[in-house]
């Protein structure tokens, strides 16, 4: 299994989610994040004092089986390219194990009194 983390512009989320849906890959989580890059940060000013402004981005996270990694990367690339001027950073991490933490009626233990 692999975990894919994609940081992209908010405008590209619709295209990427549509491309993942067409490739039948999912589900995924989405989070709003702010990136602060001191080397290339846009400058703002407050009462004449300059400060770095963060860039608003969206982070998508999904865990896929080994055989779906390449199709998922291609779907993400196609979703970004469909937008035209899209920009994204993709990180692929190997996952050794995962577990579902939601309680289910079949796995609950009965308490003895």
Indicate where each model-derived feature is located.
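Positively charged, small/polar-rich N-terminal and surface patches that mediate targeting and assembly
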Residues: 1-113
């Amino acid at each position: 299994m692999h975990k894919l983390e994609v940081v992209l512009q908010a405008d590209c989320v619709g295209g990427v989610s549509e491309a993942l849906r067409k490739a039948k890959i999912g589900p995924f989580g989405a989070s709003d994040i702010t990136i602060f890059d001191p080397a290339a940060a846009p400058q703002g000013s407050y009462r004449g004092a300059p400060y770095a402004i963060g860039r608003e981005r969206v982070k998508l996270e999904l865990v896929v089986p080994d055989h779906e990694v390449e199709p998922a990367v291609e779907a993400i690339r196609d979703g970004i390219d469909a937008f035209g001027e899209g920009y994204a950073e993709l990180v692929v991490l190997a996952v050794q194990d995962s577990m579902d933490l939601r309680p289910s009626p079949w796995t609950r233990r009965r308490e003895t009194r």
